[in-house]
Amino acid sequence: MNKERVENAVRELLTALDQDITSEGMRDTPRRVAEMYVSQCTEEDAELERTFVTDKLNDLIMVRDIPMHSMCSHHLLPYYGRAHIAYIPHKRVLGLSKLARLVYSCCKGFTIQEEVTKDVADRLYEELECKGVMCVIEAVHTCMSLRGAKAIGASATTSAVRGVFRDAVAARGEFLSLINKGGPR
């Protein structure tokens, strides 16, 4: 990734939009924007290989309200919200913080919420070889509020279901009720 090229491209974009890039408020904007985009596009691995082996745990494990943000690949604008993940283990469990790291890893680059939701569920299901996974993401998209529909405050909800959650209505219901239950804040 070439930060200097990104900075020059931002400078060119602002100039094409007739913005005074020499003004006090805009002088460092190309550098700041370039740093933001380079940071957003720098991959982070979630390291799901480090697990705890157990035969005793086979009930729902859940982490909710994981803060998330990404950049929409359609408009290059941010979206942000919360991810909720549940899984039923099969011989291995993750440290709970790894679920947050997985979300952050899947949010890197320019992507849409639907892809992030699918990627979180797929990676956890395949790499942990668990019995089932559910991922729900609720997010506010600035592309919806700043352009087009100007739907300020609207949010989008996406879900991905893998394994036993597909057929286990009670387990799905438990997960969804736990999302809405609230908890320590």
Describe each region flagged by the PLM.
Residues 1-185:
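A domain-level signal for the structural core that forms small-molecule/cofactor-binding pockets
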